[in-house]
Amino acid sequence: MIGAFKRNRGSSQSFAKECQPSTLKANLEVAKELPFSDRRDFEDATQGYIGSLSDEQIIGPDGGVVWCMKSYGFLEPETPANTVNPSLWRQAQLNAIHGLFKITDNVYQVRGLDISNMTIIEGNTSLIIIDTLFTTETAQESLKLYYRHRPQKPVRTVIYTHSHSDHYGGVKGIVKEADVKSGEVQIIAPVGFMESVVAENILAGNAMHRRSQYQFGMLLSPSVKGHVDCGIGKAASHGTVTLIAPTIIIEEPVEERTIDGVDFVFQLAPGSEAPSEMLIYMPQQRVLNMAEDVTHHMHNLYALRGVEVRDGNQWAKYIDAARVAFGSKTDVLIAQHHWPTTGQMRINELLKKQRDMYKFIHDQTLRLLNQGYTSRDIAETLRMPSSLEQEWSTRGYYGTLSHNVKAVYQKYLGWYDANPANLNPLPPVAYAKKAVEYMGGADAVLARAYKDFQKGEFRWVASVVNQLVFADPNNHQARELCADALEQLGYQAEASTWRNAYLVGAMELRQGVPKRRSTGKRNNIAVLNNEMFFDFLAVRLNATKAEGKIIVSNWCFINSNERFVITLENCALTYIQGWQTDADATITLKRTTFEALLANEITMVDFLRSKEVEIEGNRLRIEELLKLFDDFDQSFPVVEPMGGST
């Protein structure tokens, strides 16, 4: 899942500093250790190229830039910049290759026009689209690019491989919702798709969107000192994210369907890269689509934006099941990120090494935690076997061995390391103030931290000086030194996600947090069923404001004729289907009107005055209830305490 935030271009590079000698040394060592002479990935990434956008950018209806690849022209030199890890530089170059590509007869991909790929299959009379990119603008332009080179068959089928927004967000750019409702267009998705969308993008959506700014570097300008890549793709487009609910659900572990003359075998892979995911084999074309379960890097078992931990053991089994079932019958392996792999020997080798990578991380973490090591101990000491470490396809550009180890630990043992000293620590600000006091005060800490910074001990400096920031966010020397340390860590990071997080943290320490209020997610809210809708509403209930209140109301939605009893009691909002005769009030409304209120498109006054809203009984109780819900702030602080600096 990726949040749709516009990059604040030009704001980060002007404050950025040069790399320190120790950073330069570390990056030069990387250049010596890895097989940079192996150019097969570049050959694969350019094979089948047909054409691309002439000006390398996509402009939205408001005139804003939605996507711009030419901003990454600085990646053209073979020699990496000193401020970028050479391994990440190579991945960034590969992800900069963009356009329409032929995979095999009747199968095409648009790559590099968003963070994900669009796969286009030509049926007898129509097109079948696998994944619709992140935004409507990039999806629309990708389809236009295809039509410039291929027959203009209509899109009649959309397939979502999984429940992350960069794979469904552009759907309204290529099909109309009315055509889906009429049955003219079908949308196919794996079982649990909508539930996963709600859980990841709605219930915890605001926090994930904010954290996504760090993971994907959405506030950074493209430059050698700023944004260079996202590992899984170049960058997330910043346009319009939409969603149309699927009309057909794949429910069986392996399910075969024929769509407009094209045979498909769907293999469910729940709990792998997403809670709801499936792999796709096309026997006529001998193409295996591994969705996002096999890509050209180490993926996340835990995403830094926040997500349910993924099961590395099960993930490995899904990969092997696909290898056994389809490996000997596949000539081209594709995914919904990155470039294809051709030839059975190479395909099977890729599948085996990806399988073994996730299996190794899972099993070795469990071996060591069973010996009593903590997650941080294991992450610090475990190393990949040399047979995998020298493979480009297992390098950590998105996930890392370090945070994937911690994910496995969390999955089995949770956050607590069993040391009672860590059972109930002080909260961050109180801890920071006490720690600074014990260390002799801010000046003493800064004096030692400056010396350690010169030695290249950036991890320690960032950690200890961030305590100064939390103890006193107005300590500008501490903010600057912490930013400097984070920046050097970013310059050294092989993982795009780590680089982005470090550099966004440095930027916000220097410039503050860009302020923006949530405008809601109308498109996502609109596709929720009523139960999901009330779950989302309950998450926004402010318990402090609700203290001591008991409100019972009937809700009747005109569009669906469904009725619910909503109860506020004990600072919890619950619901059941039905009707309560002695409720405080009854509200009859079109759900779209309430969606507009939750998305901040209309005010409370407008809502209550709307002709589409009727209230019987105690109107004041409905007003009282609606005032209890929070409007989430998309700009909450991350590298400084809540409240921030003044």
Swiss-Prot record:
Binding site for Zn(2+) 2: D166, H167, E292, H337
EC number(s) given by UniProt: 3.1.6.-
Sorted UniProt keywords: Acetylation, Hydrolase, Metal-binding, Zinc
SUPFAM superfamilies given in the database record: Metallo-hydrolase/oxidoreductase (SSF56281), SCP-like (SSF55718)
Gene3D superfamilies named in the record: Alkyl sulfatase, dimerisation domain, Metallo-beta-lactamase domain, SCP2 sterol-binding domain
Positions bearing N-acetylmethionine: M1
Entry keyword Metal-binding: yes
Functional note: Alkyl/aryl-sulfatase. Enables the use of SDS and 4-nitrocatechol as sulfur source.
PANTHER family: ALKYL/ARYL-SULFATASE, ALKYL_ARYL-SULFATASE BDS1
Additional observations: The presence of this bacterial-like protein in S.cerevisiae results probably from a recent horizontal gene transfer event.
Family indicated by similarity: Belongs to the metallo-beta-lactamase superfamily. Type III sulfatase family.
Protein name: Alkyl/aryl-sulfatase BDS1
Species: Saccharomyces cerevisiae (strain ATCC 204508 / S288c)
Gene, per the UniProt record: BDS1
